Amino acid sequence: MAKKKSKSRSKSSRRVLDALQLAEREINGEFDNSSDNDKRHDARRNGTVVNLLKRSKGDTNSDEDDIDSESFEDEELNSDEALGSDDDYDILNSKFSQTIRDKKENANYQEEEDEGGYTSIDEEDLMPLSQVWDMDEKTAQSNGNDDEDASPQLKLQDTDISSESSSSEESESESEDDEEEEDPFDEISEDEEDIELNTITSKLIDETKSKAPKRLDTYGSGEANEYVLPSANAASGASGKLSLTDMMNVIDDRQVIENANLLKGKSSTYEVPLPQRIQQRHDRKAAYEISRQEVSKWNDIVQQNRRADHLIFPLNKPTEHNHASAFTRTQDVPQTELQEKVDQVLQESNLANPEKDSKFEELSTAKMTPEEMRKRTTEMRLMRELMFREERKARRLKKIKSKTYRKIKKKELMKNRELAAVSSDEDNEDHDIARAKERMTLKHKTNSKWAKDMIKHGMTNDAETREEMEEMLRQGERLKAKMLDRNSDDEEDGRVQTLSDVENEEKENIDSEALKSKLGKTGVMNMAFMKNGEAREREANKETLRQLRAVENGDDIKLFESDEEETNGENIQINKGRRIYTPGSLESNKDMNELNDHTRKENKVDESRSLENRLRAKNSGQSKNARTNAEGAIIVEEESDGEPLQDGQNNQQDEEAKDVNPWLANESDEEHTVKKQSSKVNVIDKDSSKNVKAMNKMEKAELKQKKKKKGKSNDDEDLLLTADDSTRLKIVDPYGGSDDEQGDNVFMFKQQDVIAEAFAGDDVVAEFQEEKKRVIDDEDDKEVDTTLPGWGEWAGAGSKPKNKKRKFIKKVKGVVNKDKRRDKNLQNVIINEKVNKKNLKYQSSAVPFPFENREQYERSLRMPIGQEWTSRASHQELIKPRIMTKPGQVIDPLKAPFK
């Protein structure tokens, strides 16, 4: 076993040395793997080299030349051919590789000897090495590029051949070693495996380098032109290549050179690409920056629209296009055949010359003085101003679409024509045309759709609708009426047959009756009482007309025909709807006259309504005198005035009354003019006559009527003035006097007593103080005793209650402490400090956006909005909506003003 291990180690070390030698040879480029076959070829050549150029120029038809050329061609080798045979494999360090290779070489050598050796190569094709070296020097000087192109090819071919031979020798040596061992891979250490791997990787690297394309660093010699590039020797610079500076030296423009300098930079390799997640993040950031810059352009417009009080859409003004109409010409030259024909007609008629009008204007103003010219200019300016105003007014009125407005304007125009009463041929012609249209269309009849609907739905009962329909029928009659021509005979006579005003009214009434009969049988005017009233009015009008005609004829007027009739058996007295029947005689008439006079005297009212006279009348002794009149009625008279006082005493009492009670000092004049009710009372018994009873009834009726006419203020005043003595304050002198003095001193009261009587029992100040105290106690903090009775004590029979020392008192917080109230030092004020939580949502915690401070906001709230406090323009501005749009208008998106 020891011998076997030593042998394997020696073989492995030998294989390592072979592998190292092969690697060094490949790295150094030394391919000395020439075989015996090569030696034999070298021996036959005798130090000569085949002239390949000559062979390429020679005859290619001979078979020998073909064989020689084929021997120098680069062919693709199969794996079997590279290993030496199809059946046997050349394995690294195999013991069979060398024997196989020796057998193949011997066989090839025998075949070549049988064929007669190198018969395909002529002696003329051979050339000495010295000649080859001389040719290389010459070609390098004349045309270095061609030699450099050809020599690498030859070198590459030689290297390929040498590599093949070296690989074959290695395989043979390896095969010999493998033959000595039965299993070469059984006892291979790890170090040996690492060495083998290194050799294999080095081989692979060399193969990739050999297969890489060769780069030519040389160019053709000679001067550079449009067909030939400059040579490497002629190029400037250390690297021998054309640089950017060489190209920029030709340019004279400095600005271009400065811009080109930006292209200069050190070429560097690309960095390792970032992960996709980070790349997407960078892309999003870049996109956000671009979009932010684009959106920031609209910031000013958005802020302006937000701060604007009113926005009228569309914000973009519509583009106005000047469309050429059929009557306006855009150019002086005619564009169509029609324009050419029109120009031709104008030129033939001498109307197309604009200079002609200007000449006439110059001639008209040539003879004018400067003052006349200025006057004419002023008149023309005024005319143009008036025309402009009329045009503007006409455009404004034309836009009005109200039917009511059109109807009113039409009536006004017709009324003005009637008032003008100027008849001309044009008016007659217009009237004839309107009359013909009316007779043909019958527009102002009840045949129209509107009139039929009004009659069908019973709208004729409405006063306005009925009036409109009547006006329509009258308009139709006016349009159909003929124009009355005046004859010459009538003008000579001077007698114009006209009706009087009363007859015209009568005729109009008849026409209106006929019209109403056409309209229908319903309505207020067709009721019985309305018809009776119209009939009475008609009879009165007829009577008036008859009297006027009698006056015209010279007859007398009998105004009072009822005076001739005698009153036989009945005397009618108007007394609120009652009739009293008495025998018709002259005595009864006299009695009635006396009764009326007596009643008027009874109804006279005393003018003195002052409080002083009333008090004097109540306190002084009043005598009642009863008397009986001739008719048997007992009349009780109550004298309102007492005993007459002296003038001085009356004046003194008046002055004292004014000083004592100033409320009664300034009485209005109306109180003095009001009449006092009658103080006489008619006592009626069974024996009273009918006239007395009738007079009493008439007097009562008149009194009731007067009471109804009086207002509430007068009634209240009467009640105040007729107060009883029990409700009046009487002040008596405590030191006493006579009864007369005491009666006089009743009126001597003071103003304080009147106030005390007016506000008796009204202690307002005390009530206010009590209410304020109650409010303070309710809103103040309170202490509530929450101690429960019996809690913590003994109960039951024999238990004695103890005085409990500990009390549980809870303090309830009120609205505000009484010491911190705002009305603490204000005696006559109560300030409510309760907070209503329902009102908190209507209170603003901060000032709204447009306002800067609280004063501005409160000032805006104080400003009224209604039409009653502001002008029409201000009201419209205040209620104007913030966003206004026109119906049917296309709202396009905003156009960027910065483009």
Swiss-Prot record:
Compartment annotation: Nucleus, Nucleolus
Composition-biased stretches (Basic and acidic residues): 36-45, 588-615, 683-704
One Pfam family named in its UniProt record: Utp14
Protein residues bound to ATP: 260-267
Signal sequence bounds: none
Modified residues (Phosphoserine): 34-35, 151, 423-424, 488, 500, 562, 668, 738
InterPro entries: SSU_processome_Utp14
Sequence ranges of Polar residues compositional bias: 619-628
Record-level Gene Ontology MF annotations: ATP binding
Keywords attached to this entry: ATP-binding, Nucleotide-binding, Nucleus, Phosphoprotein, Ribonucleoprotein, Ribosome biogenesis, rRNA processing
Compositional bias ranges of the Basic residues kind: 1-14
Residue segments, region Disordered: 1-197, 485-509, 559-721, 776-805
Main location: nucleus
Biological process terms in GO annotation: endonucleolytic cleavage in 5'-ETS of tricistronic rRNA transcript (SSU-rRNA, 5.8S rRNA, LSU-rRNA); endonucleolytic cleavage in ITS1 to separate SSU-rRNA from 5.8S rRNA and LSU-rRNA from tricistronic rRNA transcript (SSU-rRNA, 5.8S rRNA, LSU-rRNA); endonucleolytic cleavage to generate mature 5'-end of SSU-rRNA from (SSU-rRNA, 5.8S rRNA, LSU-rRNA); maturation of SSU-rRNA
Origin superkingdom: Eukaryota
Quaternary structure annotation from Swiss-Prot or TrEMBL: Interacts with snoRNA U3. Interacts with MPP10. Component of the ribosomal small subunit (SSU) processome composed of at least 40 protein subunits and snoRNA U3.
Chain's role: Involved in nucleolar processing of pre-18S ribosomal RNA.
Note: Present with 1470 molecules/cell in log phase SD medium.
Family: Belongs to the UTP14 family.
Protein name from the UniProt record: U3 small nucleolar RNA-associated protein 14
Species per Swiss-Prot/TrEMBL record: Saccharomyces cerevisiae (strain ATCC 204508 / S288c)
